[in-house]
Curated annotation (Swiss-Prot):
It comes from Centruroides limbatus (Bark scorpion). It holds the Pfam family Toxin_2. Transmembrane segments: none annotated. This is Potassium channel toxin alpha-KTx 1.9. Expressed by the venom gland. It is found in: Secreted.
Amino acid sequence: HFIDVKCTTSKECWPPCKAATGKAAGKCMNKKCKCQ
């Protein structure tokens, strides 16, 4: 799912994804973070 975090690289999404889902897995898509 997408979370409301802007990004330029996938690495930027790992900490917020870990906070949101418990897993540090995510990608940057369309400048927004998508968590696994």
